[in-house]
């Protein structure tokens, strides 16, 4: 596809500045949402070209293309756009850490009462927490006593008792069969 030099430069500038680019998979979209006056189709086609040259890495999810600039792509765009080596994409810049406390501080909401020594924060939930439990409704959960003898108190009342198909329950079956 023939892409004008101005559109190619606009796409390349945006890609180098941000380090990433996305486009909706809509070839009829008249303009890309982030790059002014460039059709969405031209963005997709230029990125396909960059992908084949391994300048970008492509991911597709939820009807959107996502392209991430590679090191080779950074070198290519730096020479194409005549940029010095001090300028780097936004994805390679270290983010500034905010000054101040990380988890709140100040704010409109009043803080709760201070906790005493050893006091649990969520005392109403202690029943759900682990630890030693009392006997309760179902007894101790430690296990069966040592002298416990389990037994089967089955019920077909007569002949041979068993499990599954050999039980001889409904209709006689194989165990108590009177058939010749």
From Swiss-Prot:
Record key words, sorted: Cytoplasm, Ribonucleoprotein, Ribosomal protein
Coiled-coil region: none
GO MF assignments: mRNA binding; structural constituent of ribosome
InterPro entries with a match to the protein in the record: Plectin_eS10_N, Ribosomal_eS10, WH-like_DNA-bd_sf
Pfam families linked to this entry: S10_plectin
Ranges annotated as biased composition (Gly residues): 152-180
GO biological process: axillary shoot meristem initiation; regulation of secondary shoot formation
Gene Ontology CC, one term: plant-type cell wall
Basic and acidic residues: bias regions: 108-128
Region ranges (Disordered): 92-180
Location in or out of the cell: Cytoplasm
Gene3D superfamilies found in the cross-reference section: Winged helix-like DNA-binding domain superfamily/Winged helix DNA-binding domain
Family label: Belongs to the eukaryotic ribosomal protein eS10 family.
Record protein name field: Small ribosomal subunit protein eS10y
The organism of origin for this protein: Arabidopsis thaliana (Mouse-ear cress)
Organism taxonomic ancestry: Eukaryota, Viridiplantae, Streptophyta, Embryophyta, Tracheophyta
């Amino acid at each position: 596809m023939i892409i004008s030099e101005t559109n190619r430069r606009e796409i390349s500038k945006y890609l180098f500045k941000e380090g990433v680019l996305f486009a909706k998979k809509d070839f009829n979209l008249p303009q890309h949402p982030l790059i002014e006056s460039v059709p969405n189709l031209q963005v997709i086609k230029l990125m396909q070209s960059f992908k084949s040259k391994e300048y970008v890495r492509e991911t597709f999810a939820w009807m959107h293309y996502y392209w991430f600039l590679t090191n080779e792509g950074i070198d290519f765009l730096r020479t194409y756009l005549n940029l010095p080596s001090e300028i780097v994409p936004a994805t390679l810049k270290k983010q500034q850490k905010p000054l101040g406390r990380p988890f709140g501080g100040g704010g409109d909401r009043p803080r709760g009462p201070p906790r005493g020594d050893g006091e649990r924060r969520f005392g109403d939930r202690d029943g759900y927490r682990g630890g030693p439990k009392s006997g309760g409704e179902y007894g101790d959960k430690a296990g069966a006593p040592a002298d416990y003898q389990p037994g089967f108190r089955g019920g077909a009342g007569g002949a041979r008792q068993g499990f599954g198909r050999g039980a001889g329950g409904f209709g006689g079956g194989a165990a108590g069969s009177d058939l010749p």
